From Swiss-Prot:
Its cofactor is Mg(2+). GO terms for cellular component: host cell cytoplasm; host cell nucleus; virion component. The lineage of its organism: Viruses, Varidnaviria, Bamfordvirae, Nucleocytoviricota, Pokkesviricetes. It is found in: Host cytoplasm; Host nucleus; Virion. Belongs to the ubiquitin-conjugating enzyme family. Its EC number is 2.3.2.23. This is Ubiquitin-conjugating enzyme E2.
Length: 215
């Protein structure tokens, strides 16, 4: 079953390429994906092309995938070995999974969540204690140099590790890239058990609909 879901998602992403990430699939194992995430514009991570691996469990989409950075990262919520600490991918037990993971989540939503996390760390739940301490000092203007300097090192190293083809891909895509919303990981509509959605309307739209009905 997992293969059916992944083939559909992969096909959708290939037909609708993103300016913010690039994906490739292990030819021998569709449950293993390689991704490159573009550092969000106007942030310390801008210009970086960070590599990661995504592993999908046999229970997917009823259990979350695991994302591990292979590029060196300096971030409060990324372990030194590349493992990621983000609520959207928590699913170690039924209670936790019910609170944070939904089968309706798609891989593009996950990747946008990770990109958003780069610029919006949660230092209160650190995976890298040293990075979290450095980030706090940066936020409270106690040390404005150390954290940016370490991040910029990872940006440069990520580019050194990328192929010219990958760099060219993102260079061409960066000409008109929309900003990534800070709440990209949040559902834009209410999920239902049958994977259909209830769309919400703005007040102005409701008023227009009422006027049309009166006519």
């Amino acid at each position: 079953m997992v293969s059916r879901f992944l083939i559909a998602e992969y096909r959708h992403l290939i037909e609708n390429p993103s300016e913010n990430f690039k994906i490739s699939v292990n030819e021998n194992n569709i449950t293993e994906w390689d991704v490159i995430l573009r550092g969000p514009p106007d942030t310390l991570y801008e210009g970086g092309l960070f590599k990661a691996k995504v592993a999908f469990p046999p229970e997917y989409p009823y259990a979350p995938p695991k994302l591990t950075f292979t590029s060196e990262m300096w971030h409060p919520n990324i372990y030194p070995d590349g493992r990621l600490c983000i609520s959207i991918l928590h699913g170690d037990n039924a209670e936790e999974q019910g609170m944070t993971w939904s089968p309706a989540q798609k891989i593009d939503t996950i990747l946008l969540s990770v990109i958003s996390l780069l610029n919006e760390p949660n230092p209160d739940s650190p995976a890298n204690v040293d990075a979290a301490k450095s980030y706090r000092k940066y936020v409270y203007k106690e040390d404005l140099e150390s954290y940016p300097m370490e991040v910029k090192k990872t940006v440069k190293k990520s580019l050194d590790e990328c192929s010219p083809e990958d760099i060219e891909y993102f260079k061409n895509a960066a000409s008109n890239v929309p900003p990534i919303p800070s709440d990209a990981y949040e559902d834009e509509c209410e999920e239902m058990e049958d994977d259909t959605y209830i769309l919400t309307y703005d007040d102005d739209e409701e008023e227009e609909d009422e006027e049309m009905d009166d006519e």
